[in-house]
């Protein structure tokens, strides 16, 4: 008579099989969602916009940190830094570094991205009427500089991210620095910057989709 496996081993075998039975359908559904085009286009940008809306009433705390530690921070480099990823991308293309798209396709996609970003940002600015931290006007939400910077960073990612992750890392580092500087310069709330980043990313995603 063959040996009978101990009860504990049988139970262990049953327990080990259960995840396979129950997780496979769930895994297939999860894979279907994450592979969907709409998910690929929105899984970063939408959460950033939602975060911007969610922290709207908590931005004063971050402004107070600025007032406590760097009250005299006033530098205009963010006026130029926002364009840096796009300038570098065009420079790489001009020097013959192969990108994802042809010149024509890249310029059309980028033009769509700019048009979408500008229209969305300005429409919200003129309807939300959020006062800037420095009280200069009521066009604070969302941050146009941050939207431009993240739109440009996403362009770089689309065109050169597959060649090296450092293109993407560098571009988004510059974009993040732009957003932070807008807060340090007392021109925007944290909520403005988060929403602007999300809008910029979504604009490029849609611009390259069209």
Q: Each PLM stretch: what is its role?
A:
Residues 1-98, 105-110, 210:
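N-terminal targeting leaders of membrane proteins
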Residues 20, 24-27, 65-66, 85, ...:
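A generic structural signal for ordered alpha-helices
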Residues 39, 73-84, 100-105, 109, ...:
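Solvent-exposed, acidic/flexible segments
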Residues 45-49, 107-123, 151-152, 194, ...:
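Hydrophobic, lipid-facing residues on alpha-helical transmembrane segments of integral membrane proteins
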Residues 46-49, 81-91, 116, 120, ...:
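Lipid-exposed faces of alpha-helical membrane segments in multi-pass integral membrane proteins
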Residues 57-64, 119-127, 145-149:
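Hydrophobic, membrane-facing alpha-helical anchors
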Residues 90-99, 120-132:
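Membrane-helix exit/interface motif
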Residues 125, 130, 134-210:
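Membrane-embedded catalytic cores of phosphoryl/pyrophosphoryl-handling enzymes
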